[in-house]
Protein backbone atom coordinates (compact mmCIF):
# COMPACT_ATOMS: atom_id res chain seq x y z
CA UNK A 1 0.00 0.00 0.00
CA UNK A 2 2.80 2.40 0.94
CA UNK A 3 4.60 1.67 -2.35
CA UNK A 4 1.42 2.43 -4.33
CA UNK A 5 0.96 5.72 -2.44
CA UNK A 6 4.56 6.71 -3.16
CA UNK A 7 4.08 5.80 -6.84
CA UNK A 8 0.93 7.93 -7.07
CA UNK A 9 2.67 10.89 -5.42
CA UNK A 10 5.57 10.58 -7.88
CA UNK A 11 3.14 10.38 -10.81
CA UNK A 12 1.28 13.48 -9.62
CA UNK A 13 4.55 15.37 -9.21
CA UNK A 14 5.68 14.32 -12.68
CA UNK A 15 2.31 15.30 -14.13
CA UNK A 16 2.62 18.77 -12.63
CA UNK A 17 6.20 19.08 -13.84
CA UNK A 18 5.24 17.77 -17.27
CA UNK A 19 2.25 20.10 -17.49
CA UNK A 20 4.49 23.04 -16.71
CA UNK A 21 7.13 21.85 -19.19
CA UNK A 22 4.53 21.32 -21.92
CA UNK A 23 2.59 24.51 -21.17
CA UNK A 24 2.39 27.11 -23.88
CA UNK A 25 -0.49 29.21 -25.11
CA UNK A 26 -0.42 27.65 -28.58
CA UNK A 27 -0.57 23.98 -27.59
CA UNK A 28 -3.40 21.59 -26.87
CA UNK A 29 -4.31 19.86 -23.62
CA UNK A 30 -2.25 16.98 -22.29
CA UNK A 31 -3.91 13.57 -22.67
CA UNK A 32 -3.41 11.33 -19.63
CA UNK A 33 -3.92 7.57 -19.98
CA UNK A 34 -3.61 4.99 -17.20
CA UNK A 35 -2.07 1.60 -18.06
CA UNK A 36 -2.89 -1.70 -16.33
CA UNK A 37 -2.86 -5.43 -16.95
CA UNK A 38 -6.66 -5.49 -16.77
CA UNK A 39 -6.81 -3.54 -20.07
CA UNK A 40 -4.69 -6.10 -21.95
CA UNK A 41 -6.28 -8.55 -24.39
CA UNK A 42 -6.37 -11.04 -22.79
CA UNK A 43 -6.19 -9.42 -19.33
CA UNK A 44 -2.89 -9.94 -17.46
CA UNK A 45 -2.52 -10.79 -13.78
CA UNK A 46 0.15 -8.25 -12.81
CA UNK A 47 0.79 -5.54 -10.25
CA UNK A 48 2.48 -3.44 -12.93
CA UNK A 49 0.93 -0.10 -13.74
CA UNK A 50 1.74 3.00 -15.68
CA UNK A 51 0.63 6.31 -17.00
CA UNK A 52 1.36 8.03 -20.28
CA UNK A 53 1.15 11.77 -20.89
CA UNK A 54 0.63 12.81 -24.51
CA UNK A 55 0.79 16.41 -25.69
CA UNK A 56 0.02 17.15 -29.35
CA UNK A 57 1.50 20.26 -30.93
CA UNK A 58 -0.99 22.91 -31.97
CA UNK A 59 -0.23 22.31 -35.65
CA UNK A 60 -0.56 18.50 -35.42
CA UNK A 61 2.99 17.79 -36.57
CA UNK A 62 4.43 16.38 -33.35
CA UNK A 63 3.45 14.54 -30.19
CA UNK A 64 5.35 14.97 -26.92
CA UNK A 65 5.16 11.93 -24.66
CA UNK A 66 6.24 10.77 -21.21
CA UNK A 67 5.70 7.14 -20.18
CA UNK A 68 5.95 6.38 -16.45
CA UNK A 69 5.79 2.81 -15.10
CA UNK A 70 5.90 1.02 -11.75
CA UNK A 71 6.16 -2.56 -10.52
CA UNK A 72 7.17 -3.86 -13.95
CA UNK A 73 10.15 -5.96 -15.02
CA UNK A 74 11.90 -6.89 -18.25
CA UNK A 75 10.41 -4.15 -20.42
CA UNK A 76 11.42 -4.67 -24.04
CA UNK A 77 9.26 -2.12 -25.88
CA UNK A 78 6.34 0.31 -25.67
CA UNK A 79 4.19 1.56 -28.52
CA UNK A 80 1.06 3.37 -29.59
CA UNK A 81 -1.04 0.77 -31.40
CA UNK A 82 -4.11 1.30 -33.56
CA UNK A 83 -7.17 -0.59 -32.40
CA UNK A 84 -10.37 -0.17 -30.40
CA UNK A 85 -10.78 -1.21 -26.77
CA UNK A 86 -10.93 -4.98 -26.39
CA UNK A 87 -9.01 -5.71 -29.59
CA UNK A 88 -5.31 -6.02 -30.36
CA UNK A 89 -3.91 -4.01 -33.23
CA UNK A 90 -0.60 -3.34 -34.97
CA UNK A 91 2.16 -1.00 -33.84
CA UNK A 92 1.93 2.56 -35.14
CA UNK A 93 4.40 4.64 -33.10
CA UNK A 94 7.34 3.37 -31.05
CA UNK A 95 7.70 5.08 -27.66
CA UNK A 96 10.43 2.79 -26.27
CA UNK A 97 12.57 0.10 -27.85
CA UNK A 98 15.80 -1.56 -26.93
CA UNK A 99 15.10 -3.13 -23.58
CA UNK A 100 16.64 -6.58 -23.43
CA UNK A 101 14.72 -9.65 -22.25
CA UNK A 102 15.44 -10.27 -18.58
CA UNK A 103 16.57 -6.67 -18.03
CA UNK A 104 15.03 -6.39 -14.55
CA UNK A 105 12.71 -3.98 -12.75
CA UNK A 106 11.76 -0.51 -13.93
CA UNK A 107 10.09 2.13 -11.74
CA UNK A 108 9.80 5.69 -13.02
CA UNK A 109 10.08 7.37 -16.40
CA UNK A 110 10.57 4.64 -19.01
CA UNK A 111 10.70 7.03 -21.94
CA UNK A 112 10.07 10.63 -22.88
CA UNK A 113 10.45 12.46 -26.14
CA UNK A 114 8.76 13.90 -29.19
CA UNK A 115 7.36 11.82 -32.03
CA UNK A 116 7.39 13.66 -35.35
CA UNK A 117 6.27 10.74 -37.52
CA UNK A 118 4.68 7.33 -37.05
CA UNK A 119 6.81 4.24 -37.63
CA UNK A 120 7.62 3.87 -41.33
CA UNK A 121 5.44 1.30 -43.08
CA UNK A 122 3.23 0.79 -40.02
CA UNK A 123 0.19 -1.45 -40.53
CA UNK A 124 -2.12 1.26 -39.15
CA UNK A 125 -1.76 3.19 -42.40
CA UNK A 126 -0.59 6.31 -40.55
CA UNK A 127 1.66 8.57 -42.60
CA UNK A 128 1.75 11.65 -40.36
CA UNK A 129 1.35 12.49 -36.69
CA UNK A 130 -1.96 14.12 -37.63
CA UNK A 131 -3.14 10.66 -38.74
CA UNK A 132 -2.22 9.36 -35.27
CA UNK A 133 -4.04 12.26 -33.61
CA UNK A 134 -7.14 11.62 -35.73
CA UNK A 135 -7.17 7.96 -34.63
CA UNK A 136 -6.68 9.05 -31.01
CA UNK A 137 -9.70 11.35 -31.29
CA UNK A 138 -11.92 8.42 -32.28
CA UNK A 139 -10.72 6.17 -29.44
CA UNK A 140 -8.93 3.79 -31.79
CA UNK A 141 -5.47 3.89 -30.22
CA UNK A 142 -3.85 2.46 -27.13
CA UNK A 143 -0.45 2.37 -25.45
CA UNK A 144 1.04 -1.06 -24.78
CA UNK A 145 4.14 -1.93 -22.72
CA UNK A 146 5.74 -5.26 -23.66
CA UNK A 147 7.86 -7.49 -21.37
CA UNK A 148 9.95 -10.63 -21.80
CA UNK A 149 12.09 -12.50 -19.26
CA UNK A 150 14.09 -14.18 -22.03
CA UNK A 151 13.24 -17.69 -20.86
CA UNK A 152 10.93 -20.05 -22.77
CA UNK A 153 8.03 -20.49 -22.64
CA UNK A 154 6.54 -16.99 -22.77
CA UNK A 155 3.47 -15.61 -21.00
CA UNK A 156 4.39 -17.28 -17.72
CA UNK A 157 3.59 -14.28 -15.51
CA UNK A 158 4.59 -10.71 -14.69
CA UNK A 159 7.70 -9.64 -16.55
CA UNK A 160 7.05 -12.16 -19.33
CA UNK A 161 4.26 -10.92 -21.58
CA UNK A 162 5.82 -10.21 -25.03
CA UNK A 163 2.40 -9.29 -26.45
CA UNK A 164 1.91 -6.71 -23.71
CA UNK A 165 1.76 -6.58 -19.92
CA UNK A 166 0.03 -3.23 -19.38
CA UNK A 167 -2.19 -1.28 -21.70
CA UNK A 168 -4.34 1.83 -21.73
CA UNK A 169 -6.83 3.04 -24.31
CA UNK A 170 -6.12 6.64 -25.33
CA UNK A 171 -9.24 8.76 -24.91
Question: For the regions a protein language model found, what residue spans apply to each?
Answer:
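Bacterial N-terminal signal peptides that target proteins for export
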Residues: 1-8
Amino acid sequence: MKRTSVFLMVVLALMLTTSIAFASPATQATIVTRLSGAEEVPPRDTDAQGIVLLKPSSDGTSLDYRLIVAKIENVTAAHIHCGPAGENGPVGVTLYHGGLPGSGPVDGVLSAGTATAPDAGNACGWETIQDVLDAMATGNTYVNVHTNDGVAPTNTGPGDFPGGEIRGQIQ
